[in-house]
Amino acid sequence: MAAASAQGGRTGGGGGSSGPGGGPTCGSGSGRSGLLDKWKIDDKPVKIDKWDGSAVKNSLDDSAKKVLLEKYKYVENFGLIDGRLTICTISCFFAIVALIWDYMHPFPESKPVLALCVISYFVMMGILTIYTSYKEKSIFLVAHRKDPTGMDPDDIWQLSSSLKRFDDKYTLKLTFISGRTKQQREAEFTKSIAKFFDHSGTLVMDAYEPEISRLHDSLATERKIK
C-alpha cells in the first residue's frame, strides 16, 4: 500500500510539472500527503481490536489530537489534567496519613485521625467526580494558538468525543474559544467507525484526517471573517 501511494505521488507530481496551472493543485496535495506519510514513517500504524470500544475511541482521540498538535502546530495545555492529578494527589495524601498514623498509634488510639482521613478521602473523591463530570466532561485536548503579533490572548481549541457502548457512531466535537472576544463556537461530526478502520482494525488516516481538518477549517474561517 505504501509503495502504491509513493507511485501515485510520483505520477501526480509529474503531471503537475507538465501541465499548465497544475503546480498549485499538486503542491496542495503533496502537503497533505507529506503530513500523512510522515505519520506512517514516524509512528507504527494504529491497529486495534474493532470490537473493543475503549480501544477504538482512544485511537480516534489520539489521532485527532495529533492532527491539531502536529499539523496546525498548536500548543497543548495540561491544565485540566493537572487539576485532576492535584485532586487525586490530595486524596492519596489522606490515605497515606491514615496508614502512617495507624502504624505509629495503633487502633483504637488512631480512631479520630482515621475517621477524619476516611471522610476527607471520600470528600475528595466526590470533588473528583464533580470535576470530571462538569469541568473535564469528555474533553481530551485543550490546545492554545499563539497570537502571531503577541498582542491578543491565545485562542483556545478543545477536542471532545463520545462513543456509546454497543454503538458504532463516533462523535467528535471541536470547540473554538476566541482569546480576544471570549466567544465560543463549536463544530462536530458523527460518523460510523467503519469509515475510519479497515477490515484488519487499522486506522485509515487518509479517511480520518480530512474530517478533522474540515471541522477545524470551518471554525477557523468563521474566526477570520469576524
Curated annotation (Swiss-Prot):
Topological domains, Cytoplasmic: 2-86, 133-226
Alphabetized Pfam families for the sequence: SPC25
Cell location: Endoplasmic reticulum membrane
InterPro entries named among the record's database cross-references: Spc2/SPCS2 (IPR009582)
GO biological process: protein targeting to ER; signal peptide processing
Lumenal side: 108-111
Region (Disordered): 1-37
Positions where N-acetylalanine occurs in the chain: A2
Gly residues bias: start-end ranges: 9-32
Keywords: Acetylation, Endoplasmic reticulum, Membrane, Transmembrane, Transmembrane helix
Membrane topology according to the record: Multi-pass membrane protein
Gene Ontology terms: cellular component: endoplasmic reticulum membrane; signal peptidase complex
GTP-binding listed as a keyword: no
Residues spanning the membrane: 87-107, 112-132
N6-acetyllysine found at: K169, K191
Family recorded in the similarity comment: Belongs to the SPCS2 family.
Function field: Component of the signal peptidase complex (SPC) which catalyzes the cleavage of N-terminal signal sequences from nascent proteins as they are translocated into the lumen of the endoplasmic reticulum. Enhances the enzymatic activity of SPC and facilitates the interactions between different components of the translocation site.
Subunit architecture: Component of the signal peptidase complex paralog A (SPC-A) composed of a catalytic subunit SEC11A and three accessory subunits SPCS1, SPCS2 and SPCS3. Component of the signal peptidase complex paralog C (SPC-C) composed of a catalytic subunit SEC11C and three accessory subunits SPCS1, SPCS2 and SPCS3. Within the complex, interacts with SEC11A or SEC11C and SPCS1. The complex induces a local thinning of the ER membrane which is used to measure the length of the signal peptide (SP) h-region of protein substrates.
Name of protein: Signal peptidase complex subunit 2
Protein's gene: SPCS2
